[in-house]
Amino acid sequence: MSTPHPDEFSGLTALVTGGASGIGLATARLLASRGAQVAILDREIPAHGGTGGGVQGDYPPGNSHQGSGPFGSGPLDGSLMPVIADVTDDPAVRSAVAAAVEAFGGLDILVNNAGIGAAGTVESNDDAEWRRVMDVNVLGIMRTSRAALPALRAAASKRGQAAIVNTSSVAATAGLPQRVLYSASKGAIYSLTLAMAADHVRENIRVNCVTPGTADTPWVARLLQAAPDPDAEREALKARQPMGRLVSAEEVAAAIAYLASPYAGSVTGTALAVDGGMSGLRLRPPPS
């Protein structure tokens, strides 16, 4: 896959939460492969080790090493700056964001991707589980955005724009069985995105979200392994999406990169579906 703007993020800096695997890692690699300096924030970043707050590993600022391929398969580890933080821990989030801003000299793009799943009906989970999921999926975005906004404002003042991209879900726009808590959290992200876009549009900070369908990520793989028949469950998830397959992490990353790009300068308050047609298509059954 090629891009008409291979260096569209040159000179820009980005922070990707939940960046150690799946959609977050694919996004970080793609942004770096197109010229950005990228920090990944996660609770654990195995490739770099370390357990404390702030910067971990051997990231060399300004010394990015790119691999081949559109999604940087690399970039190599050295091109991504790891910062360790739990998005439910406000002091840790503030410290991690400050570390990235200090290392890069600013911040142009925030990708709020960190999140966890939940299964069951409205009766299935107790109050503690509801609080836990909302704390990560919704309040986590609030914490990282709040910590990053001063740097994003400075970037917008200097360059004319900055960007926040949130990861919502098709669960925010379509009713899925056994996903009440997860859907509530992702629906909140959808609404949060619109409200943030309205609040910050006059500061030239664009706020958008992606709404992925079921993606082929390590998290989904773990869910499948817990199913009584993992192969049958995978086929059911594929069949639920009109294109007949799972969404790839790289496809979601490409959508995030578009929304974060300076070339999307007039795009704000938008939810971009990457769901194989799941939210919008109503197909007839295939001929027997």
Question: Which sequence ranges carry the predicted segments?
Answer:
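Alpha-helical segment proximal to the catalytic Tyr-Lys
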Residues: 150, 198-199, 265
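Active-site loop immediately N-terminal to the catalytic Tyr-X3-Lys motif
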Residues: 123, 174-180, 202-203, 244, ...
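Active-site helix of classical SDR
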Residues: 145, 185, 193
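Short, small/polar-rich loop/turn modules that mediate ligand/substrate recognition or access, typified
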Residues: 201, 206, 267-269
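Short C-terminal tail/terminal secondary-structure segment
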Residues: 2-5, 174, 268-288
